Amino acid sequence: MPKRILCFGDSNTFGWIGSLEGPTHRFPSDIRWTGRLTALLGPDCEIIEEGLGGRTLRDQFTVGSGVFVPGAGLCGKDYLPACLLSHLPLDAVVIMLGSNDMKSALNRSEHDIAEGMAELADIVLKFPWQELLDYPRPRLLIVSPPLIGARKMELAGERYVDAPRKSRALAALYKKIAESRNAFFLDAASCLTDEPAGEAHGPDGMHLTEHDHELLALGIAGKLKEILSLR
């Protein structure tokens, strides 16, 4: 049976194409980092995409997100249990969230955001589905999101006050969460080597470009091979 890997995230898992105006599209599946995992990991792995624009770790709304779903639908903490149960069995879960939580309207510090990630990690690692379904728990890979830099602040700085500093603090906090739970960690910023390094390079300063998706896929694939003992 193929290794089943759930990728849970926001618009950068969905494959949102950054745009400065008007409706946009998502990258095709073979361009998105999730789709590239299929090619990189081979036929012995099945990738399950669960990306939603505007998703937060534990807030039930995202002001000005432009996403037309009820507020609770954007809350990772509320949605994740049903998501896990609907996709069992799972061998690994990859979570990359935190960018939307840095919006000024939510008033979340970097420590608040990290606490939200800890709650999601505990759902994956402690949720009692084994009372009903006899499947082992998946391994967990926590991914800190790309950095927020000058480009995003030029375009929407009032919506992301202090976000550059917060985004640079998350990697260390997320790593501690992973280490304390026998989970795994990857810093997405370490994969994004184009200048300015560590940031998403879309025109809106928030979303990944095609090359960013390629680089991130390589980093995550390498980590999953380690986690799942894949060749």
Where are these regions (language model features)?
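Phenylalanine-focused residue identity feature
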Residues: 8, 14, 27, 61, ...
